């Protein structure tokens, strides 16, 4: 089989994967799920309070991914403003154009929260959206 292996095997990546799996195992799946749920609930509460922001997809029990649009501004413009404040979001159709057509939107911003995010990250996003909203008002 050696003749089919080009280059150096991904040894460092394998070690990194082992360390990541150990970290997740140490934290425990239940603790991770509880943390992500708490951050997602907090994000839903805070984002829902922003005037002129429309959340796309609000199914009960959804995870920590939030697609949204801000009235009067294109998603790419919102993403650019957020980037200036060090906030990373994705903007566009997210390879889901038929779904966006169903919701009647051309593009969205999408923010994701996971194990490594906290409520302070949600607050930073909300503050950035408010700044962008005022800029485009």
Give residue spans per PLM region:
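Pyridoxal 5′-phosphate
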Residues: 1-137
């Amino acid at each position: 089989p050696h003749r089919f292996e080009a280059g150096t095997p991904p040894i460092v990546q394998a070690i990194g994967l082992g360390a990541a799996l150990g970290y997740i195992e140490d934290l425990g799946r239940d603790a991770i799920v509880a943390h992500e749920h708490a951050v997602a609930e907090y994000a839903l509460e805070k984002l829902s309070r922003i005037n002129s922001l429309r959340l796309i997809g609000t199914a009960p029990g959804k995870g920590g991914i939030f697609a949204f649009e801000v009235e009067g501004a294109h998603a790419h413009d919102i993403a650019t403003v957020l980037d200036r404040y060090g906030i990373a979001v994705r903007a566009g159709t997210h390879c889901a154009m038929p779904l966006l057509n169903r919701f009647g939107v051309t593009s969205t911003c999408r923010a994701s929260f996971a194990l490594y995010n906290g409520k302070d990250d949600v607050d930073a996003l909300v503050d950035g959206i408010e700044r962008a909203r005022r800029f485009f008002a």
